């Protein structure tokens, strides 16, 4: 749904994005920024603005961002709150906001350069926001065009091939720890990252893979267990946590037994982390901070020509948006 009576983007109101990524922050800092931005969603109805502002919250393993059409004061307020954490957030407005999201969707701003998962993450964040709010035309336009051009960019071979990915790194870590391919692996949560790791390991010969989800998954080719039947006393050698809501979705008594199996390894892909840091055994626990460090060691440099090409496309769409808004203003004035 598109919100009616949208205020024209100009000096007072910007189409902007504020956020942090793997470049500026640790995992713990991104968790703290996510908390601030989640709280900000509830405070967008401010008396000074006298209307509810729209937003899209994009939270992934390596970035936390809030996109909105809002006054500069709102972005400034969020930036000041984030800076109290000792973090310097980035803020892009108008055409630079377009260029940023186009590069994100195209995989050029990812820690895993050229990754495809970010396209789906951007789409899901946009669709969730569209279901819950009456988004402005500008936000609809921004996300729809960024998703479209991200696909086109990949189809034309603009996005580099990601040689080192999270599934590959997980596979390497299991080999380093000499995990037998007949070992029992448990994936809790049917998230995209859990699925990509599970299918990669299956292709590498791991044959005892179990998924645990809120409900039965009829098309899954792997073993399944529903949450009500989950027991950490079962001999799962490796456990993969794919969703931050698991910390509260599963009973505390169940979590207490996650370390009971000797030498069990836990991969926590969630942001915020599914397991609080004070409850883990460091030598048996891998979170996204450690994975990010591994990925940095293998990260390729962005091709400047690819970056320039995608930004130019974004700028053209920004100009197109302004032309459309001008036509809407003219139609409204003549009505």
UniProtKB/Swiss-Prot annotation:
Binding site for NADP(+): 189-194
Catalytic activity: (S)-4-amino-5-oxopentanoate + tRNA(Glu) + NADP(+) = L-glutamyl-tRNA(Glu) + NADPH + H(+)
Active-site residues (renumbered): 61
EC annotation from Swiss-Prot or TrEMBL: 1.2.1.70
GO molecular function, one term: NADP binding
Biological pathway: Porphyrin-containing compound metabolism; protoporphyrin-IX biosynthesis; 5-aminolevulinate from L-glutamyl-tRNA(Glu): step 1/2
Regions annotated as coiled coil: none
Keywords: NADP, Oxidoreductase, Porphyrin biosynthesis
Superkingdom, taxonomy of origin: Bacteria
Residues annotated to bind substrate: 60-63, 110, 115-117, 121
GO biological process, one term: protoporphyrinogen IX biosynthetic process
NADP is among the record's keywords: yes
Pfam families reported for this sequence: GlutR_N
Site (Important for activity): 100
Annotated domain remarks: Possesses an unusual extended V-shaped dimeric structure with each monomer consisting of three distinct domains arranged along a curved 'spinal' alpha-helix. The N-terminal catalytic domain specifically recognizes the glutamate moiety of the substrate. The second domain is the NADPH-binding domain, and the third C-terminal domain is responsible for dimerization.
Extra remark beyond the main annotation: During catalysis, the active site Cys acts as a nucleophile attacking the alpha-carbonyl group of tRNA-bound glutamate with the formation of a thioester intermediate between enzyme and glutamate, and the concomitant release of tRNA(Glu). The thioester intermediate is finally reduced by direct hydride transfer from NADPH, to form the product GSA.
PANTHER family, per the entry: GLUTAMYL-TRNA REDUCTASE 1, CHLOROPLASTIC (PTHR43120:SF1)
Subunit annotation: Homodimer.
Stated family: Belongs to the glutamyl-tRNA reductase family.
The protein's role, per its UniProt record: Catalyzes the NADPH-dependent reduction of glutamyl-tRNA(Glu) to glutamate 1-semialdehyde (GSA).
Name listed for the protein in its UniProt record: Glutamyl-tRNA reductase
Species: Chlamydia trachomatis serovar A (strain ATCC VR-571B / DSM 19440 / HAR-13)
